[in-house]
Amino acid sequence: MIAGHFGFAALVKSRERQVPLWALMLAAAWLDIVFVPFFMTGVERLQTAPGTHGGYGNGIIYADYTHSFVGMLVLAAILAAICLPIWGRRSAIVIGLVAASHWVLDLLVHRADMPILPGNLAHLPRLGFGLWRFSWLSAAIESALVLLGAWAYWIAARSASMNAKQKPRLAAAVAILIATFGILILYLDVSS
């Protein structure tokens, strides 16, 4: 799930106008952004699930630090702390919660590959409901998040534009971009 994270960020933006959209998009992808250096150094890894050819939902992700429950809490708190002096307490909390939402949304689709503790300390059971096994359902949920987020963003931004006596075309253009890029990302992910 990547497109769904961005759809959720747009949905949050529709309710939290003081937080920049780009900051919410960054927060939604924060765990994956931090995953990249861990992956590049071999600390975390990806593996094709047995009996599959890879592609959408057919990977086992060993992101034992960035995608552990406790790791998510730490990373969300770090991002919120970075944002606190820039946008204030409320916005920092919102950004931290959006970063944490990444883990919750991943929990729905991931196989049981998400540990509770960083490094899978104590070897507790890994979590994940595995909706990726049903790629059509997973893709439908992501599509719904993208479209709902784009629609909610458009409604809120259009209303704000009209209240400020601005032309609401920019709001429509951004909403269309959110929906288009979200669906395109999902299509590329599913068709890989």
Question: Language-model segments: which ranges?
Answer:
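N-terminal membrane-targeting hydrophobic helices
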Residues: 1-192
